[in-house]
Amino acid sequence: MDRISQLSDDLLLQILSFIPGKDVVATSLLSKRWQSLWMLVSELEYDDSYHTGDYKSFSQFVYRSLLSNNAPVIKHLHLNLGPDCPAIDIGLWIGFALTRRLRQLKINIRTSSNDASFSLPSSLYTSDTLETLRLINFVLLDVPSSVCLPSLKVLHLKTVDYEDDASLPSLLFGCPNLEELFVERHDQDLEMDVTFVVPSLRRLSMIDKNYGQCDRYVIDVPSLKYLNITDDAVYDVRQIENMPELVEAHVDITQGVTHKFLRALTSVRQLSLCLSLSEVMCPSGIIFSQLVHLNLSTVVKGWWDLLTSMLQDSPKLQSLKLIDKQHESGLCGIETPIGWKLPSSVPECLLFSLEAFEWIGYKGRRGDREVATYVLKNAACLRTAKFSPESTDVGEKYHMLKELASVPTASTSSKLLFD
């Protein structure tokens, strides 16, 4: 303890910021110096799942801790609460933190005793200091008519509830400097028909698992650099109006992809796709002139035709990775049909730029061998070809390796790697 006490106050406060609030307060018993030091901690976390007594004692502890806090600014407040926590207490705790120029707020209401979600205090929607807001589970986004969050740059909404489909656009309209938005929906009852324009947004992640729900999104994000969309909603409709600055995109969509949607991705340098070409209505004429890295999932029907199209339309492609995500999705990679439609001529990227080819979950079936053989025979600049088979059988893996090693390669310097 003597060594720790020799550390500076700033360093000790930084250490205290990493431990739960209950333990922070307990340090006041160590010495006179610690009696006042814990009151200056600016990053506060309260989690009732660690509390062993009744809820009343937990509530009193939080009130006492907040009222004793003398930090000039509360940088971070994290509330992880269960069904016993009254909404009035949560609102008062958040309101107090806002008066101390709160910078970051994270609220996770794990479950609700009466299936009612917690509504945020109206003062939160007009905070001029809040920079990060993360809301999780039983939180209701009941947005007032006036929203002004000039400092908010990061907004995460994970499986929260919405008062109506105007809630999200209204909130975004009041965030003129928002840079990162994460939205995740799971089986929410409310159908969303959302149009939002966020000129400042640079990162957008949307995960929608509303199976059978008919949601519609129209997105205008001219400054976007990063896009991640995972969508299992069968009848979902999405439209992206403007993404000229996009650099990286990850798209995993069940249905509803349009030609216009793919055209909005043509500026990317890194692209991950899990979709069927039949969903895109044959995207001829779309050139991915900046694309360098392409990841393609093999768990959707027609992935081989999408591969053909992407090879033809990505003249600068340097890295190609085929991924069987069976372990993640529970789906098995679909075998390439015998005699799949080859490119009409050897794609430019195979002749002049492709340097790395990788196949994760390679099964060695006849159709799969055709795809692998085509790439190996035509990729003149290939440096590495790496195959990670799904099988753990040594004999089967050896047979796959022997087949691949017998393929004549266009590149004299390529290395065949086999995990």
Curated annotation (Swiss-Prot):
Pfam families: F-box, FBD, LRR_At5g56370. LRR repeats lie at residues 55-81, 132-159, 160-185, 187-208, 226-253, 254-284, 299-324. It comes from the Eukaryota. Residues 339-389 form the FBD domain. Residues 1-53 form the F-box domain. Keywords: Leucine-rich repeat, Repeat. InterPro entries: F-box-like_dom_sf (IPR036047), F-box_AtFBL13-like (IPR053781), F-box_dom (IPR001810), FBD (IPR006566), FBL13/AtMIF1-like (IPR050232), LRR_dom_sf (IPR032675), LRR_FXL15/At3g58940/PEG3-like (IPR055411). Coiled coil: none annotated. The keyword Cell membrane does not apply. PANTHER family: EMB|CAB62440.1-RELATED, F-BOX/RNI SUPERFAMILY PROTEIN-RELATED. This is F-box/FBD/LRR-repeat protein At4g26340. It comes from Arabidopsis thaliana.
